[in-house]
A protein has these predicted regions:
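Extended, hydrophobic alpha-helical segments
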Residues: 1-32, 37-46
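Short, intrinsically disordered low-complexity segments
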Residues: 27-74
Length: 74
């Protein structure tokens, strides 16, 4: 299992980002500790690139998303 940190800047006021939030929640067990930050636990086959590419479908022009593996190397 791998933990990923997902952070974003959503630039479009009033835009409905429920698809983005649902896509993040569908990745696995999740926590939403800050307004634009999530931590998700995924299976070992998931990569940061896969997550980012999936989430980009729900972003508007100018929106940014950052995905990084934060699992320990143990």
């Amino acid at each position: 299992m791998k933990y990923y940190l997902i952070s974003y800047d959503l630039k479009t006021p009033g835009q409905n980002y429920s698809g983005l939030y649902d896509a993040i929640k569908s990745l696995g067990e999740w926590r939403h500790p800050m307004e634009s930050t999530w931590v998700v636990l995924t299976d070992d086959n998931t990569t940061a690139v896969m997550i980012r590419e999936n989430l980009k479908k729900y972003l508007d022009t100018g929106d940014l998303v950052f995905v990084v593996n934060v699992s320990s190397a143990e």
